[in-house]
């Protein structure tokens, strides 16, 4: 179904990069050695340091999606989960989701548009294999 997932997280100076990364890796059931991580240092509005992590996974992506989908159903019901997926899937059939970063660090999966972990599930294009 999905060929890759790209996960993007902004980590502020007051947050623990290790805790956030560990929580995310636990959720996606991967070790740090089995994912591609790009780390970008940047600054916030008031020059405060921010780290952006971009994590790319190109194998067994459906396992991650299925785990997320199952938890979405438990939280909001199957109809609402399907409606969310439909509303957040573009014409290329990429699915865009955002999870609450603080809740994720506590082992809870919750959809959120604020201070979120952004996940983009991508399908293979017509000419890719």
PLM features per residue range, with description:
Residues 5-9, 53, 119:
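Short glycine-/aliphatic-rich beta-strand segments at the starts of folded cytosolic domains
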Residues 27-32, 72-77, 115-118:
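A common structural junction motif
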Residues 63-98:
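Mid-chain, well-packed structural core segment of small domains
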Residues 16-19, 61-68, 129:
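Short, conserved charged micro-motifs
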Residues 35-60:
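Short, charge-patterned binding micro-sites
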Residues 1-35:
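Long, hydrophobic N-terminal alpha-helical segment
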Residues 95-129:
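Glycine-rich, aromatic-bearing surface loops/beta-hairpins
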Residues 9-13, 28, 57-61, 101-103, ...:
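Beta-strand elements of well-folded, non-transmembrane domains
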């Amino acid at each position: 179904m999905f060929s890759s997932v790209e996960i993007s997280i902004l980590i502020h100076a007051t947050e623990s990069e290790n805790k956030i990364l560990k929580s995310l890796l636990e959720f996606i059931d991967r070790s740090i050695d089995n994912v591609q991580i790009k780390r970008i240092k940047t600054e916030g509005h008031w020059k405060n340091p921010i780290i952006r992590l971009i994590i790319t996974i190109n194998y067994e992506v459906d396992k991650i999606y299925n785990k997320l989908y199952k938890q979405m159903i438990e939280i909001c019901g199957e109809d609402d989960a399907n409606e969310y997926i439909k509303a957040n899937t573009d014409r290329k059939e990429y699915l865009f989701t955002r999870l609450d970063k603080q809740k994720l660090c506590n082992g809870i999966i919750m959809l959120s548009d604020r201070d979120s972990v952004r996940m983009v599930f991508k399908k293979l294009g017509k000419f890719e294999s």
